[in-house]
């Protein structure tokens, strides 16, 4: 079963390297990496755990982030494999999130994964607001996850991610 992860970077994996740090960024766990044009802070434990989940469940990753061509560099810096990134170029009057949605939808329609996991801190925060976005991806099994600003991924988010990617097709609830 193919699971496609569309992953934002800033606000999901990394943040500005200035306190206050999110609660899950334990003091001894915070690392600062060279983000090429700006230093970034990240939780080594969270990033390592995400990499393990991705590897264990053979999840395909595509970056959907304003970092675009700098994503592979940053991924190497924080210990993740280099992956494909979506071209989010477009007119200035079109918001970055609208460009992300258009690019994610086009990629999903081209590749037709059986399951989609989209993690972005700019996704809507409620299920009611996420439903139209999930439906627009034309995939029966989608999970949209939006970490809070300056929180990045947490241990609780990782549990939700594992729950989603570990489900077999028979266990998957309709209309997620």
Kindly label every feature range from the protein language model.
Residues 1-2, 61, 141, 171:
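Intrinsically disordered/low-complexity terminal segments and short unstructured peptides
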Residues 2-94:
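Alpha-helical substrate-recognition element adjacent to the catalytic core
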Residues 72-176:
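C-terminal cap/substrate-recognition subdomain and adjoining C-terminal extension
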């Amino acid at each position: 079963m193919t699971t496609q992860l569309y992953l934002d970077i800033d606000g999901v994996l990394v943040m500005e390297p200035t306190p206050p740090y999110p609660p899950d960024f334990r003091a001894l766990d915070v690392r600062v990496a060279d983000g090429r044009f700006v230093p970034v802070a990240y939780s080594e434990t969270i990033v390592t755990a995400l990499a393990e989940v991705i590897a264990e469940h053979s999840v395909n990753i595509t970056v959907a982030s304003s970092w675009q061509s700098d994503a592979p560099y940053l991924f190497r810096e924080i210990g993740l494999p280099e992956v494909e990134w979506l071209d989010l170029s477009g007119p200035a009057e079109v918001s970055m999130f609208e460009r992300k949605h258009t690019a994610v939808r086009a990629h999903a329609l081209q590749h037709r994964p059986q399951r989609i996991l989209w993690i972005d801190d700019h996704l809507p925060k409620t299920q009611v607001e996420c439903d139209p976005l999930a439906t627009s991806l034309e995939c029966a099994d989608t999970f949209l996850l939006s970490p809070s600003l300056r929180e990045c991924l947490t241990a609780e988010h990782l549990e939700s991610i594992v729950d989603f990617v570990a489900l077999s097709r028979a266990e998957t609830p309709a209309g997620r």
